[in-house]
């Protein structure tokens, strides 16, 4: 859903580009030796950046830069990406927590642990922390079994439940 919102709002031809915008931070190559990151910081390089990226907004994927072909300002991409994630993840998380909260009151929840792929996103945990801070809810990422990070929470829970039930029966 986030990918679709990004693609539609930015008028992107490629769904893959929208998916990458959702996953990776942005930068703008301002010279052959530096780029401006989406948070305003500058990142400098000792080796020159490929000249094909000069003047373009890029996605900072692990180990590579991905050029965004469309001529869209970095600020606009950032605004659309954050708003899409807020609409989908934050709104749904608050709604779901309200349903399970004692007396349907969020202030009755002391803490929340984020698990799954969304907990590994570079923006979503921070957005949720900001939204839940309003209700004085402490928010953090889970580390499943102390080794898995936030991934495999449901599968691990189901497996442990199955093992526990089979030992009882």
Sequence positions of predicted segments:
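Helical "lid/coupling" subdomains associated with nucleotide-phosphate turnover
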Residues: 2-8, 12, 27-169
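Conserved phosphoryl-transfer catalytic core
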Residues: 10-16, 21
């Amino acid at each position: 859903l986030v990918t679709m919102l990004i693609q539609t709002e930015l008028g992107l031809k490629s769904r893959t580009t929208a998916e990458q915008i959702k996953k990776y931070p942005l930068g703008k190559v301002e010279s052959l030796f530096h780029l401006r990151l989406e948070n305003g910081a500058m990142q400098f390089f000792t080796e020159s950046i490929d000249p094909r990226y000069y003047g373009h907004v890029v996605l900072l994927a692990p180990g590579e830069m991905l050029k965004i072909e469309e001529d869209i300002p970095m600020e606009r991409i950032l605004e659309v990406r954050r708003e899409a994630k807020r609409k989908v993840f934050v709104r749904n998380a608050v709604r779901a927590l309200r349903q399970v909260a004692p007396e349907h009151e969020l202030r009755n929840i002391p803490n929340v642990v984020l698990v799954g792929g969304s907990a590994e996103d570079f923006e979503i945990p921070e957005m949720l922390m900001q939204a839940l801070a309003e209700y004085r809810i402490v928010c953090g990422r889970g580390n499943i079994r102390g080794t898995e990070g936030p991934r495999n929470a449901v599968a691990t829970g189901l497996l442990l439940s199955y093992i526990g039930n089979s030992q009882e029966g």
